[in-house]
UniProtKB/Swiss-Prot annotation:
The protein's name in its UniProt record: Holliday junction branch migration complex subunit RuvB
Annotated segments matching region Head domain (RuvB-H): 257-340
HAMAP family the UniProt entry points to: DNA_HJ_migration_RuvB
Localisation per UniProt entry: Cytoplasm
Region (Small ATPAse domain (RuvB-S)) location: 184-254
Pfam family, one: AAA_lid_4
Chain positions recorded as ATP binding sites: 22-23, 64, 67-69, 130-132, 173, 183, 220
Domain-level remarks: Has 3 domains, the large (RuvB-L) and small ATPase (RuvB-S) domains and the C-terminal head (RuvB-H) domain. The head domain binds DNA, while the ATPase domains jointly bind ATP, ADP or are empty depending on the state of the subunit in the translocation cycle. During a single DNA translocation step the structure of each domain remains the same, but their relative positions change.
Record-listed Mg(2+) binding positions: 68
Gene field: ruvB
Reactions accelerated catalytically: ATP + H2O = ADP + phosphate + H(+)
Originating species: Syntrophus aciditrophicus (strain SB)
Domain of life: Bacteria
Length: 340
């Protein structure tokens, strides 16, 4: 794993190994997302009492916040099997038809990155979600005919980081919709302490708190940083993660007290130093920092915007006063007095 990948909320190679171990197995163990924890058990219990499939569920929000974990918890709480797949994997209508026909009543079908489903595949989902049947075409050319095929009563759980890319017909078919928000530092501290216990890592509360502060509100990043700080503690800190050990480890990894890595700093400093604070177009910014547009938009911008360091406008990206203060800089405009 590259150093710059440490604070990426995207799932990296090697993440799945420890994420499977660290995931909570019930809604009671799940930390954060208070609204979901309050309402989801009600929907699950109501479906169980009616002996019906749970309404289709849409989970959306930034990556790394626990959408896959929630899908697995839904399956466990309902007491049925779950089939896990993703939008890019389902390339043809026949691929989806094969998955649907192999489900059993009340099973859970989890489709990650559901916004990336091909349109032809998405159309198969419409009758499947509403009336639990699919139309399959038999034969080719003039002799081809359509046949209605009933499928089990299932629950679709769709996850996406780009809810705006979902078509209205698909989005409207989800009876339950949850937005996952970034986690508070206190919630991340609980997650880190829980993960440390599972991984047999000795950690002080102050050490967990320091890691949480630099985890960008994202559990996936928190667990990833915990592993790297553990390595440092075993070599430099007698195996115990204290605050000083966490600070030194994260500074060595060039992750500052706001959770910024080299690319975060490069984005903000490029806007400040090269473009007078902005606005600057996204394509120009990408060329300046040497990063792909989708990576900037999906990985870096959401956190910078949420924390108030970056503004996204119709004219381009603008560094805020908070960004200037973070780097100890002051903004001037030609021919004008100091703004801040």
């Amino acid at each position: 794993m590259k150093r710059d990948d440490l604070v990426s909320p995207e799932c990296m190679d090697g993440d799945n190994v420890y994420e499977t171990t660290l995931r909570p197995h019930s809604i009671k163990e799940y930390v954060g997302q208070k609204k979901i924890k309050k309402t989801l058990p009600i929907f699950v219990e109501a479906a169980q009492k009616r002996k019906e499939a749970l309404d289709h569920v849409l989970l959306y929000g930034p990556p790394g916040l626990g959408k896959t974990t929630l899908a697995l918890i839904i399956a466990r709480e309902m007491g049925f099997n779950i089939k896990v797949t993703s939008g890019p994997v389902i390339e043809r209508p026949g691929d989806l038809a094969a998955i649907l026909t192999n489900l059993k009543d009340y099973d859970i079908l989890f489709i990650d990155e559901i916004h990336r489903l091909p349109h032809s595949v998405e159309e198969i989902l419409y009758p499947a979600m509403e009336d639990f049947y699919i139309d399959i075409v038999i034969g080719q050319g003039p002799s081809a005919r359509s046949m209605k095929l009933d499928i089990p009563k299932f629950t679709l759980v769709g996850a996406t980081t780009r809810a705006g890319l979902l078509t209205s017909p698909l989005r409207d078919r989800f009876g339950i919709s949850f937005r996952l928000d970034y986690y508070a530092v206190e919630e991340l501290t609980k997650i880190i302490n829980r993960s440390a216990s599972i991984m047999s890592i000795e950690i002080e509360h102050s050490g967990a708190l320091e890691i949480a502060k630099r985890s960008r509100g994202t559990p996936r990043i928190a667990n990833r940083l915990l592993k790297r700080v553990r390595d440092y503690a075993q070599v430099k800190g007698e195996g115990i993660i204290k605050r000083a050990v966490a600070v030194h480890a994260l500074e060595m990894l060039e992750i500052d007290d706001r959770g910024f890595d080299q690319m975060d700093r490069s984005i903000l400093l490029s806007i400040i130093e090269n473009y007078g604070g902005g606005p600057v177009g996204i394509d120009t910014l990408c060329a300046t920092v040497g990063e792909e547009k989708t990576t900037i938009e999906d990985v870096y911008e959401p956190y910078l915007i949420k924390e108030g360091y970056l503004q996204k406008t119709a004219r381009g990206r603008i560094a805020t006063k908070k960004a200037y203060e973070h780097f100890g800089k002051r903004k001037f405009e030609v021919g004008q007095k100091e703004l801040f």
